Amino acid sequence: MSWFKRKDKKFKDPEKKSIPDGLWDKCPSCDEILYRPELEKNLSVCHHCEHHFRVAPQVYVDLLLDKSSETHLYQNLESKDFLKFKAVKKYTDQIVTAKTKTGEKDAIKVYDGKINGESVVLGIMNFRFIGGSMGSVVGEAVSRAIQKAIKDKVPFLLVCASGGARMQEGAISLMQLAKTSTQLAKFAKNGGLYIPILTDPTTGGVTASYGKLGDVILAEPGALIGFAGPRVIKQTIGQDLPKGFQRSEFLLEKGFIDHIVSRSEMKEKISTLISLLT
């Protein structure tokens, strides 16, 4: 037992190894700890419960459009503080912060490209840019995209992700509901195929306009889709809401959307719809 009396340690304490930030994510649905490189390889879909994480627009570009077929359109559009909106943080400062955070000019990107060889116009919203809110730039970009689809006689696809109209632009943001809906009416009159893809979340003015005006409405699994949020509705009516209320599975059951499509199957589903409906 002489080793109890040893004064000098013969063994060193193991060195603590630092783990780089950003290597792990926790699934908000099943609480599984996920290795980020593997998660991204799986299109940011949890391999345990199929929860679809929110992703950047570039993920949808790579996922949906044929390689090297895309052309980025309307890159010169930028938001302005028409109303000189004053809040805790000025609107102009919010725009600068969002641009720095996302590397984008606003909450939407528009491309023309091909899906399995078929030409399309594709719009993709970015929830990380001021909650994907619809202001003058989003409305103008969507309108121009529809006009291009009419001119080129190609389908128009729009990946929706938004908290609704951009309150910092007041009535100007609300005008975009009518503006985009009018353009979609023209598109339909010209026989165009419009497919919105509703992702988590799609709410507010986007749901009340182009989010629900599709010929075929697709949604990702588990996406929050509605006008007002569930918390607001619960407070207003004073009642508990049904399980899964405003999730894509609930909306499919009630007939508000047409198909729920996993991210990995989205391109082939859209390609099939285009071949059947054009």
Language-model features, listed with the residues they occupy:
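N-terminal alpha-helical interaction blocks
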Residues: 1-15
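An N-cap/entry alpha-helix motif that binds or orients negatively charged groups
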Residues: 13, 25-26, 53-110
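Residues immediately within or flanking Cys/His clusters that coordinate Zn2+
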Residues: 24, 43
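Short cysteine-rich clusters marking metal-coordination/redox-active sites
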Residues: 27-30, 46-49
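Cys/His-rich microdomains that often coordinate metals
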Residues: 33-34, 52-53
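Glycine-rich anion/phosphate-binding loops
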Residues: 101-107, 132-147
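A structural preference for short, pocket-lining loop segments at secondary-structure junctions
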Residues: 113-125, 141-165
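Conserved catalytic cores of soluble enzyme domains
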Residues: 163-278
